[in-house]
Amino acid sequence: MIDPKLKNKIVLISGANHGIGAAAAEAFATQGAKVFVTYYRSACQYSEEELKKAEESGVGGDVLYRAEQQKSADSLIEKINSNGGTAFAHESDLSDPSNIPKLFDLCEKKLGPVDILVNNHTYCVHETFDPSLVTKEGGGIQLTSVAGIDKHFAINSRAYAIMMAEYLNRFLKRKAKWGRIINTSTDAAHAHIANISYAASKHAIESYSRSAAGEMGKYGITVNIVSPGPIQTGYLEPKDVENINRDTPLGRVGEPEDVADVMVFLASEQARWLTGQLIYVGGGWTMHQ
């Protein structure tokens, strides 16, 4: 068995109350790492009754995805700790830059300095330039706006960048020699019709990550990007799942654990010679040239 050498490493994971982030928390804890998770439950357009019905039915779609986002991390933390791991959680709105140093302070108080930073939080509201694409069906598609652009970039780009800056600042102050940063993008970052601000804000993170890799390598920090393909975090409708199962070379929709395991690898000693790389995790749904 390969030892990733992650025992007692301290991992800070954002967006970890559900989906990929929650799976990553469990995966790192399984390797003996100590986990601090953060998340934020922003308001959504659905009623509590609609969210509850979606959870009960388990049928994928925007309502179920938003229901998953509204979960606390309490059950995740309880599960990790009951299985012999060490985990804490704190809810924080990372679109407010003043919350970021507070988050690191709290992690240090509970567990110690952060060795591995996993930026995984996301904000996604479908936006378009084209009025003919606007609809209220599903999760809805709205015209792009200053407010919409700003919110996507504040959460999906700026917060990632400030988290990396805060990580490095503290890393240097304690004269650390080993570090890992893993950022989550999307396979649609290059372009996404009717989801333009989400895609652009994720593309920005890919650039920030490569720049960070170039600047931080001399300190012993690797920075890599995970680009998930079709992963069922609640948003995929049954018809989507059917199409993906048919058209993906590996014949199935991805699960959060598929991405989490790649994150663990990128943090491991075995990935010591990887930095500035975008790793597509999508079962071959997209074949990058």
Regions found by a protein language model. Name each.
Residues 17-18:
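Conserved glycine-rich cofactor-binding loop
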Residues 31-75:
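Conserved glycine-rich Rossmann-like NAD(P)H-binding loop of the short-chain dehydrogenase/reductase
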Residues 122-130, 136-148, 152, 161, ...:
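Catalytic loop of short-chain dehydrogenase/reductase
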Residues 26, 169, 214-215, 272:
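Alpha-helical segment proximal to the catalytic Tyr-Lys
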Residues 2, 246-250, 264, 275-289:
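Short C-terminal tail/terminal secondary-structure segment
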Residues 217-222, 274-276:
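Short, small/polar-rich loop/turn modules that mediate ligand/substrate recognition or access, typified
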Residues 66-71, 91-103, 146, 257-258:
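The beta1-alpha1 cofactor-binding region of Rossmann-like NAD(H)/NADP(H)-dependent oxidoreductases
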